[in-house]
Amino acid sequence: WVAAQQVTESTKDYAVVEKIDANYENAVNPSVKLIKADGTKATAAIDSDSDTNIVAGELVKYKTNNDGSVEMTKAKTANSGKNLVNDTLNILSNATVSYNKNTKQLAFGDNTKKATTSDCVAFIEYETGKYMVAPSDSLGSFTSKTGKAYISLDKDGKVVAFLVSTDGKPSNNAS
């Protein structure tokens, strides 16, 4: 289930890699299948300037070139919620993330909290290899499974996009 959604300039450049050619750095005409922030899927050629070692299941920042190919940027490693870097797509390798629908914040195991932007996009892996995409404001409160968490912050330190894994789909934010 994917909810179509309005995406803004700050959130449209994020996608989950659904499928990517193995060893794409050395492949001829390598391609990638992305689940974009608006919930649509797209297959595109991989630009040679893309970061290396990108695998399925990662959240990437991307730009589409004039020829239709995509240049993808990997997340940078952060050791904890306190170490998340502004204006960067971060990855926490072993995190539990909670979303609070009332405060519109993500909380990390080290008691760090980060506010989400009004247009924040949540990518949720609710079953292995199955994703939902939704505005974070539309979700009910939830806690992720412990594991990789991708958190992208804007220059002000607010969350613009994130990817976490959960046991099942989070509820919607019915008040």
Regions found by a protein language model. Name each.
Residues W1-S175:
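...the same signal can extend to comparable exposed beta-sheet modules
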